Amino acid sequence: MLTTTFRLLRAADACEGSYKLFRRAMRAKGYREDQPIPLYEALDSNGLADALWALRAVPSEQREERDRVARLLSCDYAERVLHRFEAVYPKDSRPRRCIETARRFADGQAAREELLAAYRAAAGAAGDAAGAPRAAAWAAGAAGDTVWAAGT
């Protein structure tokens, strides 16, 4: 389970308003200064944007898991718009394969070289779709961005 602390959030330069909201909610639940707080608490008290931001404020021993979670979230978000590309290019599977490769990479089942090849293929799909409806090109680009995020 990913956690953070008040100290880590401050060290990561948390937005003052969001930090105060989170701190007030967590103090009411009994959390103290350096006590680990599950990140799902940030989701409950502050919403998705702040919970995603709080991923940067996890202890160093949790960074590998944090990176995996961030990569898988990127895949989930890219899949949510993939239908826009596939509606215009139903036979072009490059963006879908890109997302699948990013998932496998996050789970340790794909090499970085595979990830780079998938990124290049999705970027090619986005380029090929440049003259198509904007939503299709954007969706293919999102798949490429997913792989980029998975590799960083």
Regions flagged by a language model, labelled:
Residues 1-152:
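Short, glycine-biased loop/turn motifs at secondary-structure junctions and
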